[in-house]
Amino acid sequence: MNIMPMGNMKWMFHRGTPFHINGIFDPRNVASICGQYNSAVQVGMYDDCNIIYVFFHPYAMKMITGIPCHLFEDKNISMDDLGIPAFQLLKRMVLDAESDEKAIAYIEDFIIRQLAYRDRDSHLKQLMFVCDEINKHSFATLNQLADKACLSERQLRRIFLDNVGLSPKLMLRTRRCLRASKMIQDMTTKDFTQLTFELGFTDHSHMYKEFKQFAGMSPSEYFDHVNEIRRHHLIKGYKAYHG
């Protein structure tokens, strides 16, 4: 199953058998922090799969871990490897919880305590504003975002890499291709003309090149892939994962 980059970081807790990622199966990595990915990943699930995902706003992860987000880029790091006892304890509590509901309650309580413990970044409001602008406007440029945030482009890039894990330019491209994937998920025919126009790609060739870089397949191939997921009655969960 093809999982698109989304522009935000997440936690994964495997209360069943972990899935394999890009053909690699690591049974030890049952609780992890997933950094920002620059291209799609292929995952394979087992029958006893039981995963709790925790998705974060793009600017939120450093507020909880205290670790610069760019260090997680293209990585899926075990909570055991962070060297932070609180995360190691969280892992044990979540995996040993008597129910998913209890596990989720442990996670929520942990996040609240971490947020109360750590200082917020002085640029938090600007980060929130820029992330919101990126979500709303496919046509936004780096210069426009920096101007609206009252920052230089260099400042914005530095703050983004530290707190989001991507450059603002890469975030723009990631979100645009994610929106393209959502539109394709709802299509009934392979007509990508409207998609190209609505999302601000210069032409079909530009859209094809960008989409293939992030999705690992062409728009047409992705359309077929989504229909295969639909035939296996997994489309509801797939669409929910991608927001």
Spans of model-derived segments:
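Basic/polar phosphate-binding segments, predominantly the helix-turn-helix DNA-binding elements
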Residues: 143-172, 196-218
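Alpha-helical DNA-contacting segments of helix-turn-helix folds
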Residues: 121-125, 133-134, 160, 164-184, ...
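Alpha-helical bundle regulatory/interaction domains
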Residues: 1-128, 133-137, 141-143, 149-153, ...
